[in-house]
C-alpha cells in the first residue's frame, strides 16, 4: 500500500504546486515563468502569506459586515424607541376616555403576562443554546483573534456609541418615570369620583336583587316546561302503543283478507267450470228443440197425407232419436277431457242436491194439500187470501227465472269480455304509473319553486334591511359631521382660529356635508331634530339640548306605558272573546251531537223497516253503517271533551302568564324610571368628570400597553363567539335538513292519499263501464262457440309449451348443479393458491431479512474505507462535472435500451388486453342469452301472481313508510333534545367564564393598591408634560371614538346572546309544530284505516253477491232439470199421441216466469236507489262533522300564536336582564382595573429592562451566524471558480492524459465508496425510523395511560363542581327564602347572603380554573401525540406506496411469457454491467495482490480453476435437465382413446361455461400472483448465477492472459502498473460493450426470423386443417375424450417438430425456442386454428397433474415429439404446431440446413445419444400413428382449455438453458443464413 500511495502523493503535490504558482502569479500580476524562477522556499512563503492575506480579507469583510449590522440595529432601536414614546403619548389620551371599556379587558393582561414570562423563559433557553454555540464558535475563532486585535479598537468605538445610545434611552426612561409621578397627583382627584361610584354600586345591588327574582321566575318556567315535556312524552308513548295495537289488527285483517281472496278465487274457478257445463247443456237443448220442431211439422204433414204409414214413420223416428242420442253422447265424450272429469262429478253432486230439493218441494206441496183439505171449511176470505198468495208465488217464480236468464247472459258476456277487461286494467295501471310519475315531478318542481321563492323573499328582505341600515348610517354620519363642524368652530374661537384638525380633514367633512342629499327627502320633524340637537354654539347650549332630549324621552316613555296598558286591556278582551267563542262552539257541538243521535235513531228505525222488506243479505251492510256511526259519535264526544279540557288549561295558563307579565312589566317600569333619574345624575357628574379628564390625560402613558393586551383578549373573545355562532349555524343547517326531509315525507304521504283517491275513482269508473257493457252481451253470444274452439286449441298449445318449458327448466337446473360443483372445486383450488402465495411471501420476508443483515455487514466494511475517501475529496470536487457528463451518457444509452424493450412490452400488453376484452364480450353475450331465457320464464310465472302481489306490496309500502316516518319523528325529537342540552351546556360555560372574569377582577383590584404607591412619583413629572396638553386633546378625541366603537362591539355581544335565546324559543316553537304535524299524520293514518275498512266491506259485499249468484244458478239448474224431465215425458206422450197443447202450456209458463223476474228486478233496483240516497245523506253529514273539527283545530292554532307572543315578551325581558348584568360587571371591572393598571406598567418596565441585554446578545449571535454564512458563500464561490477553471483547461487541451484518466478512475472509485456510505446511512435511517416507531408506540401507550388518568381527574373535578353547583343552588334557594322575608329582616342578612354567594362562586371559579388547566394540558399532550401519529402514518403510507409499486411491477411481469423472456434478457444485460462493476473492484484488489507477489512465481493454475468451474457448471446443467425430464415424464401423460371420445359428445354450452369459469380463475390467480411468479423468479435467479459464473470465467481468462505477458520481476514501477491496470480494464469494457451490442442484434434477428417462420407455417396449417375438417367429421375413428372430467393438458403443445433419424433429440434444450413461439399464441388467449372461444391463461391444479401422471400410458398418436437439430438454427427456432403433411414439407425444404447443423455439432451428438434414444423412437411411432389417426380441429379447440397447463411446466424445464447456448445458436443461424 505504501508503494501505491507514493505516486498518488507525488501527483497531488504536482497539482498543488501548479495551483500555487498560478495563484501567486495572478496575485502579483506576474507571468508563470517569472514565478517558476523563484526558489521553492520562497514560493512556499509567498503562498503562506497569500493564504494569510486571503484569510485576513475574509475576516475583515466579516467584521465590517457585523459592524454595519450593529449600526443599523442600534439606529432601528433608537427609531423604534422614539416611535414608541410618541405612540405612548398619543394613546395616553385614548386610554383615559376608554377607561370604562378597558377594565373589562384587564383579564387578558394576566394571560399575556404569563405569556411574556414564558417567552422570557424561552428567550433564556435560546440564550443558553446560543451561548453554547458561541462557545463552540469561540473555540474555532481563537486562531483568528490575533489578527482581529487591530480591528477590536474600532469595535470598542462602536460599543462606546452603543453605550451612549443606551444612556439616552435611560434618560428617556427617567422622563417617563417623571411623567408617571405627575400622573399620581391626578389620581388623587379620582378618589372623589370613586365615592360616587360606590354610591352607584349600592344602587346596582338593588338591581341585582331584582335580577335574582327574575331568575327564580325563569327557573319556575323551566320546571313547567320540563313537566310539559314529560306529559308529551307519556302521550307519545301511549300513541305508539296504540299504533302497535293497530298494526297487529291490520295484520290480522290482512290475513283474513288473504283467506277470503283464496276462497273467492276457488269459488270463481268452480263458477266458471259450472258455467261451461251449463253452456254445453243449453247448446244441446237448443239443437234438440230445433230437431223436435222439425219432426213435429213433418209428423203433421204425414198424418194428413199418409195415415196408413204412421207405424213405419214411428219406427223411423225411434231410430233417428237413438242416433241423435248417440251423437250427443259422442260429442260429450269428445269434449270430456281429463280436466272435465271433475266438472262431471260436481254436476252429479248438484243433481243430487236438486233431487233433494225436489223431495222437499213435494213434501211442502203435500203439507199445503193437507192444509187445503183442512181449511176447506174456512170462509171465502181465507180462500181469497190463499189465492192471492199463490199468485204472488207464481210471480216470484217468474221473476226468479227471468233473473236467472239475465244472470246467465251477463256471465256469458263477462266471460267474453274478460280479456278486454284485463287489457283495460293493464292500461289503467300504466296510466296510473305515468300519472304518479308526473305528479311526483310536479311536486318536486313545485317544492323547488317554493324554495326558490322563499329564498328570493328572504334576500329581498335582507336587501331592504341593508338599505334601511345604510340610510340610518348616512344620517348618523351627517349628524356627526355637523357636530364636529360646530366643535371646530368653538375650538377655533378658543384657540385663536387654530383648530385640532388639519385642512385636509376639514375639507373631507365639508365634502360630506355638500354631498348630503337627505335634506330634500327629510321630513319636517327630522329637520327640526337636526336643527335643535346637531347644531350648537357652546357646550352650555349642548347641555341644554341634552336636557330637552331627556324631557322628550320621558314623555315618550309615558306614552309607551299608556299604550302597553291599552294593549293589555285589548289582550284581556281577546281572551274573554276566545273563551266565549269556545263555549259557544261547545254548545253548538252538543246540539249537533243531539241532531246526529236523533238522525241515527231515525236511520235505525228505517233499517228495521227495510229488514222486513229486504232479504237477509243487506243486514250486514246496515250493521256496518250503524257501527261506523256509533264509532264516529264516540270519536266526536271524546274530541269535544279533549277540546273542553284544553281550552280550560289554556285559559288558566294565559291568565297566570298575563298576571306574571303584568307584574314583571310594572317592576321594569319602576326600575326604568329609577335608572332614568340615575342617568340624569350621572350625566351631570360626567360633565364634571370631563372637565377633570383634561387634567388627567398624562395617565394614559401607563395604560397603553394594557390597552393592547385588552384588545388581544377582546379579539380572543370575539373568536370564541364566532366559533359558537358557527356551531349554532351548523345546528340550524341540520335542523333545516331535517325539516326538508319531513316535508318530503309529507309530500309522499299526500301523493299516496291522492293515489288512493284515484284508485277509488277508477274502481267507480270500471263499475260504470261494466254496467255499460251489459247491453253488448247479445251481440257477443254468436262468438261463444268460435271462442270455445279457439280456447281448446290454445289450451293444447299451452300444455305443449308448458311441457317444453319444463323440459328446458330441468335441463337448465342440471347444468346449474354441474356449474355449482365446478365452482366449488375451483374455490378449493383458489384457496390452495392463496396458501401458496402466503408461503412465498414468508419466504421473501426471510430473504429480505437475510439481505438486510448482509447489508449491515457491508456497511461496517465501508466505514473502514471512509478514512481513505476523505483524503481524496479535494480531487473529487474538481472532477465532479466530468463524472456527471459520463453518467448522463450512460443514462441515455440505458434509456435507449429500455425504450426498445418497453415498446415490445406495450405491444404484447395491448394484444393481451384485446384478447381479454373479446373474452369478456363473449361472456356478456352468453349471460344476456341466459338472462333472456330466465326473464321469459319469470314473466310467464309472474303474470299469474302480479295482481295479488301488487296489492300486498302497496299495503307493505304504506306500513313501511309509516314506520319510517315514526322513526324520523323520533330522531328529530332526539336531535331537538340534544340541541337543548347543548344550549344548556353553553349557558353553563358562559356562566363559568363570567365567574372567572370576576375572580380576575378581584386579583386586579389587589394589584391596583401597589399602583397607588407609584402615583406619588408621577407628580414630580407633571411640570414637563403641561406643554404637550394641546396635542393630547387631539388624541383624546380619537380615544373617545374608539371608546364608542368598543361600546358598540359590546352591544353586538349582547345581541348575539339575545339571538341565541331567540333561537331557543324558535326551537321550542318548532317542537310544537312537529307535535302538530305528528297529530296530522295520526289523523291521516286513521283516515287510511277507514278507507281500508271500506274496501274490505266492499270485498265482502262482492263475496255475498257471488254467493247469491251461485244460489241462483243452482235454482236455475233445478228448473232446467225439471224442464228436461217434462220434455222427456212429453216426447213419450207424443210417441203415443199428438198432444200439441202441452208444448204451448210450457211456453206460456216460461213467459210468465220471465215477467215475474222482470218485476222483481225493477223492485230490487228501486230498493238499491233508495239505499244509495240514504248513504249520500250520511256522507254529507260526516263531511259537516269534519268541517267542524277543522274549525276547532284552527282555533287551537290561534291559541298557539298567543303562546308565541308570550315567549317573545319573555325574550325581551331576558335581554333587559342581560343588559343589567353587563352594566354591573363593567362598573365593577372599572374599579378593579384602575388599581391593577399601575402594577402592570411597573412590571412591564422591569421586563423591558430584562429583555434589553438579551436582545443585544441575540443580535450579536445573529451577526456571528451571518458571518458564517458569508464564509460558506465565499467557499462555494471558490469551488465554482475552480470548476470553471478546470473546464477551461479541459476545453483548451481537449484530450486527457493517461494520468488524468487514472485520476478520474480513482475518483470514480471514491464516489462508489461514497455511494456505499450513503446506502449505509439509508440503512441507519431505516433503523432510526423503526426506533421512532417503537418510541411512538410507547408514547402512545403512555399517552393513553395519562389520558385515562386525566379523564379520571376531570371526572373527579366535575363531581366536585357538581357538588359546588348543588351548594350554589342551595345557597340560591336560601337567598330566595330570605328575599321573601326581606321586609321583616334587615340589610345585615343580605350582606351575609352575598358573602355566602361570593364564597361559593370563588370555590367554583377555582375548580373551573383547575379544570381549564387540566384540559389545556390534556389537549396539548393529545395534539403532540396526534402529530407524532400523523408523521408515522405518512411514513407508513410512503412504504405502502413503495410496496404497491413493487407489486405493480410484479403484476406487469406476469402478463405474458414472451414479456418475461424479454425482461430476462434485460436483466441479464443489467447483470452484466453490474458484474463488470463488481469485478473491476475485485480485479483492483487482485492486481494489488499480484503486484505484491510478482517477485515470486505464481503457484495458482488458472486453467485448473477454469476446468473445475466448467465441470461444476456442466454438472448443475445436467442435474437440471434430468429434473426437467422427470417432470415432463410425469406430466406428459395422455388419456386413453375411449375416454377422449366423450369430449366430442359434450355440448358447446358446457365448454362456454368452463371457459367463463377459467377466465374468472385466471383473473383471480393474476391478482393473487400464483405459482408462475415463483417459478419465473427461480429461473431468473438460476440464469443470473450462471451468467455471473460465465462472466467471471471470461474475465479471469483475460486477466491471466494479460498477466502472463507481464514479466516476473520487481523492477516495474508503480506508474507502469497503474497503466497496465487501466489498459486491461478499458479493453475488458470495450469487449463487454461489443458483446452486449452483438447480443441485442442477435436477439432482434431471432425475433424477426421466428415471426416470419411462424406466419408462413400458420398459413399452411390453416389451409390443410380446413381440408381435413370434412374427413375428420365423417371418420370418427379416434374421437378424443376426457379422463374423469379432466381435460387433456397437452393439446396446446405442437404435435410434431421436424423429426429426423440422423439428428439427435433433446426436448429440453429445444423446448425453449418452441416456447417462444407458443407463448404468444397461448398467452394471447385464442386458438388460431379452431375454437371461437379464447384460451385460458396458464393455470391448473397440481392435483389434476398428479392424477394424469398416475393414469395409463397415452396413445402414441397424441404424444408430442420434439426434434431440435444440434445446430439450433431456423428449424428449432420456428418449430410450432403441425400435422404430418407440414412435417414432410419442412423436411424436404430444409435438408441443407440439417446437414450443416449435423456437421457443426458432431461432438455434442456423441454425448447426448444415450439420453435421446427413447424420445426419438417415440417420435417415429408418433409419425406412423398420426398418419392413420388424424385429429379434427374441433377436438383441438375443445382440449385447448387445459393444454396451457403443460406448456407452463415445459417452459419451467426449458428455461434452464443458459445465455451462452443462445449466443452459439445465433452465431450458427447467421452462418446458415450466409450459406
Curated annotation (Swiss-Prot):
The modification Phosphoserine is found at residues 379, 1670, 1710, 1733, 1803. Component of the nuclear pore complex (NPC). NPC constitutes the exclusive means of nucleocytoplasmic transport. NPCs allow the passive diffusion of ions and small molecules and the active, nuclear transport receptor-mediated bidirectional transport of macromolecules such as proteins, RNAs, ribonucleoparticles (RNPs), and ribosomal subunits across the nuclear envelope. Due to its 8-fold rotational symmetry, all subunits are present with 8 copies or multiples thereof. Interacts with NAB2, a hnRNP required for mRNA export. Interacts with MLP2. InterPro entries: Leu-rich_rpt, TPR/MLP1. This is Protein MLP1. Together with the closely related MLP2, involved in the structural and functional organization of perinuclear chromatin. Together with MLP2, associates with the nuclear pore complex and form filamentous structures along the nuclear periphery. Has a role in the localization of Esc1 to nucleolar regions. Together with MLP2, mediates tethering of the some telomeres to the nuclear periphery, probably mediated by YKU70/YKU80 (HDF1/HDF2) heterodimer and show perinuclear location dependent silencing. MLP1 and MLP2 are involved in telomere length regulation but not silencing or telomere anchoring. PANTHER family: NUCLEOPROTEIN TPR (PTHR18898:SF2), NUCLEOPROTEIN TPR-RELATED (PTHR18898). It comes from Saccharomyces cerevisiae (strain ATCC 204508 / S288c). Pfam families: Nucleoprot-TPR, TPR_MLP1_2. The gene is MLP1.
